[in-house]
């Protein structure tokens, strides 16, 4: 458990952790490239390590270091055991598609209790459209998933754009193996598009090209067939999702902090946290590779469309508690499909602290109260809730006890140490 007490002042220089999204994609691409790749500044978090270990089961040789991963990619081989991806939904979804391209046999992918409840049916249906054989062992669209090796026999696949961008990322990374050119056609408006832009960016660095389809009655992506992943040296940038908690702390608390390793021109959708706090009234300074914050600032509630930024919702919920007026979060139905139902969780847990939050079908309405009280909070094994609630606890009267703090190892392994380094009144018990 994490014990958090009111923190009067934070000061210091700290780096955002490496991007989880970029690390996942880079290590998988490098494993599919025949040759040696050097991945600099990878995230040594539990989820990304799950991707690395899974890639080893498919034949890659990976040397894991704190500052660099050395990946010797090769042709895909059939795993000699069940592939257990722990708690990493990204790993499960990307490798479900990729595993169809082993030379022969079957792959079985599974994970922990949480992963075995996360929806997979839209991806399974899409892969079946391509002529591939894959299914849930429980016949309910959840892991364990069985995938048979097979040739892609169709060049068009239709999939919803409003469920999970990870399904589309899986298709993008699988279809280059097809002998023919392919199209991914979206049947609904796209959500979380920045994550797909990250996928396209990483694929490009590893020699695979993805094009966009933007026609009057058709939208999606086009992928050339017979493409080959190529090894490269790749540096992974800092993670704006993780930096959002540092930004929130900076604008809400008496502060003087510099957050390094976040880039002004990043393709990450969650860079929007900077624009959000600016619109709320925080005069933060964004430079080419860092953000400077001298808080606190008086914030005003605003309306925020979270279509492309679902991972920012817990941070926004905390910001809204201390803003004047109402903060409205909308277009967030997909936020319910993360590690937990984050809309319900933020409502239930922050309400324990005295927050005024109304849960809507697609979002939240947060009425600023400017004062929270310490409470005992559940986090439902969700790393983003732990970190967002920590910021709330640093501003609350009394003591806040946060359960499940070990989940931060997924995306921000040294979160507690970094927060302590700038003066946060927190400890693990």
From Swiss-Prot:
> EC number(s) on record?
2.5.1.19
Pathway, per UniProt?
Metabolic intermediate biosynthesis; chorismate biosynthesis
Catalytic activity, reaction form: 3-phosphoshikimate + phosphoenolpyruvate = 5-O-(1-carboxyvinyl)-3-phosphoshikimate + phosphate
Give residues annotated as binding phosphoenolpyruvate: 20, 89, 118, 166, 342, 384
Query: Which compartments is it annotated to reside in?
Result: Cytoplasm
Indicate yes or no for the key word Zinc: no
Please provide one cellular component term from the Gene Ontology annotations of this protein: cytoplasm
Q: Which InterPro entries does the record cross-reference, listed alphabetically? A: Enolpyruvate_Tfrase_dom (IPR001986), Enolpyruvate_Tfrase_sf (IPR036968), EPSP_synthase (IPR006264), EPSP_synthase_CS (IPR023193), RNA3'P_cycl/enolpyr_Trfase_a/b (IPR013792)
Against Pfam families, the record matches this protein to: EPSP_synthase
State the Gene Ontology terms under molecular function.
3-phosphoshikimate 1-carboxyvinyltransferase activity
Q: What keywords are assigned to this protein?
A: Amino-acid biosynthesis, Aromatic amino acid biosynthesis, Cytoplasm, Transferase
Q: Which family does it belong to?
A: Belongs to the EPSP synthase family.
Q: What does this protein do?
A: Catalyzes the transfer of the enolpyruvyl moiety of phosphoenolpyruvate (PEP) to the 5-hydroxyl of shikimate-3-phosphate (S3P) to produce enolpyruvyl shikimate-3-phosphate and inorganic phosphate.
**Protein known as:** 3-phosphoshikimate 1-carboxyvinyltransferase
Organism of provenance: Methanococcus maripaludis (strain DSM 14266 / JCM 13030 / NBRC 101832 / S2 / LL)
